[in-house]
């Protein structure tokens, strides 16, 4: 039996505007006490009228341009009607009939191959509140609390076509999207804070039986890893059902972190269930072509453009350029270092290994040092004052404390010995102590030189400059 996985994504992006979508309440509500950033508009009190946040429109256009969408001069808001405890109005203001943008795409790199993922639509809407479930899980909660602070926070929803064919591709797509959002500075993209939320629709096509399963929606995937894990689980669950000739329910399921399984939440709603109709209190949004062009001119260099430039200007492999460019802070750090130290590949290697390792161990996406720290480390190696081994040894302390490398090296007495007169005496002693190895070298077994270097390093407790030691040995032995 042969199966094909079909995945489409619905991604909600929380915009970093100062105020909410349709009122003047602050939009950055993550750390606020419950129900302290609300007003009659965002809680749907009778007689309260919404006004459109123009920055929200500009941010949506920026995202649409970055995703190669067609932007419509005319768009309109609608009401999506449903009942849920975190939706005090009983409806959500969204764009259903006339979204601000459609027909875009984003290219992703999968195992060295470029794959184009089409984007069906991009529309603006307001967020709902947040339910806090007290108990074991959403299905076992004894009771739930409602925080209305998030009501009315501006969102952009991005809906892809079902072009993704694996859980891995879904993860890669969301990772790259977050990178673009951060470059544009329109969203923090912090999944753990709910600023980027991904729902997936997955179905499986049985190629031997020419049968496609019902579509299942998967929610509660609040990290890149969980996107991949949840979809892997759901993919296997549906395949097993098809193998056993069992029905696959059309439903919404949630990823349970504790059990590492998806659990049924509710039946899958149809669009007709929401009874969409035009929002009567908000006029249509008219975006002149001139405004779109002005926003387009203001766009920064995006990841794909930066990758191309890094490859052509600095001559580093595309893989390196991609790793560096996916994080704007890392890309800027790299360029600042290369401007000072003309070693683009060496600096790229250092960032991708030593620095990313430290960031991972600290579970941080932030760089805690300046380019000056890394440049000083490279200059010390260039001068022969420290070896690569010592540089790697002190770097974790540099990264975690912010101290300059030279200061740490001085404190620990790690400065490399490059004095040829001093090293010559040590080399002579090593050669005198190992006459058999000297004879082997003279008989043509030049590989033994590594043994001599090792003995000198042992004598100096790793402080000798190995290049200088190597040169002295060859001079003495001829």
From Swiss-Prot:
Which keywords are on file for this protein? ATP-binding, Ligase, Nucleotide-binding, Protein biosynthesis
Which Gene Ontology terms describe the biological processes this protein takes part in? glutaminyl-tRNAGln biosynthesis via transamidation; translation
Q: Which domain of life is it from?
A: Bacteria
| Any one Pfam family match given in the protein's UniProt record, by short name | GatB_N
Catalytic reactions of this protein: L-glutamyl-tRNA(Gln) + L-glutamine + ATP + H2O = L-glutaminyl-tRNA(Gln) + L-glutamate + ADP + phosphate + H(+); L-aspartyl-tRNA(Asn) + L-glutamine + ATP + H2O = L-asparaginyl-tRNA(Asn) + L-glutamate + ADP + phosphate + 2 H(+)
Query: EC?
Result: 6.3.5.-
A GO MF annotation of the entry reads: ATP binding
For the keyword Nucleotidyltransferase, the answer is: no
- Indicate yes or no for the key word Flavoprotein: no
Q: Which family does it belong to?
A: Belongs to the GatB/GatE family. GatB subfamily.
Protein task:
Allows the formation of correctly charged Asn-tRNA(Asn) or Gln-tRNA(Gln) through the transamidation of misacylated Asp-tRNA(Asn) or Glu-tRNA(Gln) in organisms which lack either or both of asparaginyl-tRNA or glutaminyl-tRNA synthetases. The reaction takes place in the presence of glutamine and ATP through an activated phospho-Asp-tRNA(Asn) or phospho-Glu-tRNA(Gln).
Provide the assembly information. Answer: Heterotrimer of A, B and C subunits.
Protein name in UniProt? Aspartyl/glutamyl-tRNA(Asn/Gln) amidotransferase subunit B
Protein species of origin? Pseudothermotoga lettingae (strain ATCC BAA-301 / DSM 14385 / NBRC 107922 / TMO)
| Lineage of the species this protein comes from | Bacteria, Thermotogati, Thermotogota, Thermotogae, Thermotogales
